[in-house]
Swiss-Prot record:
Protein's name in the database: Histone H1-like protein EM5
GO terms under biological process: nucleosome assembly
Species in which this protein is naturally found: Ensis minor (Razor shell)
InterPro entries named among the record's database cross-references: Histone_H1/H5_H15, WH-like_DNA-bd_sf, WH_DNA-bd_sf
Listed GO MF terms: DNA binding
Protein location: Nucleus; Chromosome
Family: Belongs to the histone H1/H5 family.
Matches recorded under SUPFAM superfamilies: Winged helix' DNA-binding domain
Entry comment describing in which tissues the protein is expressed: Sperm.
Keywords annotated in UniProt: Chromosome, DNA-binding, Nucleus
Primary localization: nucleus
Top-level taxon: Eukaryota
Gene Ontology CC: nucleosome; nucleus
Amino acid sequence: MITAAVGALKERGGSSRQAILKYIQANFKVQANPAA
């Protein structure tokens, strides 16, 4: 999931943790876990 998120975001300087989390929540069936 993480590699798919980083590949899809295509951010030049790397993807932030928040951006990866937002992408995963939007595109995969996962429960929102604020501790993650």
